[in-house]
């Protein structure tokens, strides 16, 4: 924005233009998801064309703001401003991964879903061309968590919405730095078919002390010791994990991902139950892919 403000030359540039893959949940009854798009410009107004639909916005403080209905797949955007008699453009292509609101509205279009638990943030894994979207609570016909609350890392002055730990065994720390604690279940009303499911865990509570981070000085984490939580995992009535103790089996601050396959018949969907043996069950992230 500072470059736009100080420049004497005409400027028009999409904000966050390095964010090539996006994702979100479809609006109820629709085949699109509204997300914000910003355009930096030192003109008075900006015209934005998205998939051949024209939008206009005034520039305020060198930013034009739009709310765009992204559809599944490739979305083409063109921003245009006029300076005196000259027209200037910027182009952006976004691969949008639309997640179902109601599975019945997706028919056979559903392929995959990657969900971060205990957070509202989105994470783009550029290496694997994958987008992770935030959790939502389950409602009938859709998907989401049942019960629990987001993990909060305790500090001297309150808490943080995620862990700052470097997670061993993964290059994608954001997948494991948040979790839902005390989760009762995760349910998806998917159509009949074969699916691959991956559950991601990390034990974030440990007695390992780390070097203080420069950006976090004064808000130091309080270490409460390793958790000895033990729980069972039940997939559509079948135990797939019994007496799972993550810290004992895998260690703390380590990425754990376990994959399962399931066939869904008779419209039963998928339901994962977490059954406490000791302490509170957790889930950091969830993935599902349809096997074609």
Features from the language model and the residues they span:
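Compositionally biased, intrinsically disordered or flexible polar/acidic segments
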Residues: 97-292
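Substrate-binding clefts and catalytic carboxylate motifs of secreted carbohydrate-active enzymes
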Residues: 1-111, 116, 121-125, 158, ...
